[in-house]
Amino acid sequence: MLSNPKRTRFRKQHRGRMKGVSYRGNHICFGRYALQALEPAWITSRQIEAGRRAMTRYARRGGRIWVRIFPDKPVTVRPTETRMGSGKGSPEYWVSVVKPGRILYEMGGVSETVARSAISIAASKMPIRTQFVIAG
């Protein structure tokens, strides 16, 4: 199920900049294995969900998966063939702002080989370079 905030204070946001590295959310907290971002990017709720589904499908019933990012930034898109002006477009989808070092997914309760395979499948769904990390 695609995730987005239940309610926000404002409908639209500035685009912002992604400079520097992530100093929050860059340590493994819940599981034993994790997928860590190496590049800055906006990751859409669809991409997050695709990665989560791929990991869940590969791990079957064993193990537990934690998604450590949440899409809380609305991205607006103007209608096609619209002239300039007349305000900002309407919110179309949600993204999570990810900086280098950020943990995207965590996994526990499975062997390292299973975790490595599942996380590599999820990594292929991501628009950025990532690395497999082991806690400890």
Curated annotation (Swiss-Prot):
This is Large ribosomal subunit protein uL16c. GO terms for cellular component: chloroplast; mitochondrial large ribosomal subunit. InterPro entries: Ribosomal_uL16, Ribosomal_uL16_bact-type, Ribosomal_uL16_CS, Ribosomal_uL16_dom, Ribosomal_uL16_sf. It comes from Illicium oligandrum (Star anise). It comes from the Eukaryota. NCBIfam families: rplP_bact (TIGR01164). One of its GO terms (molecular function) is structural constituent of ribosome. HAMAP family: Ribosomal_uL16. Coiled coil: none annotated. Keywords: Chloroplast, Plastid, Ribonucleoprotein, Ribosomal protein. Belongs to the universal ribosomal protein uL16 family. It is found in: Plastid, Chloroplast. Part of the 50S ribosomal subunit. One of its GO terms (biological process) is mitochondrial translation. The keyword Nucleotide-binding does not apply. Pfam families: Ribosomal_L16. The keyword Chloroplast applies.
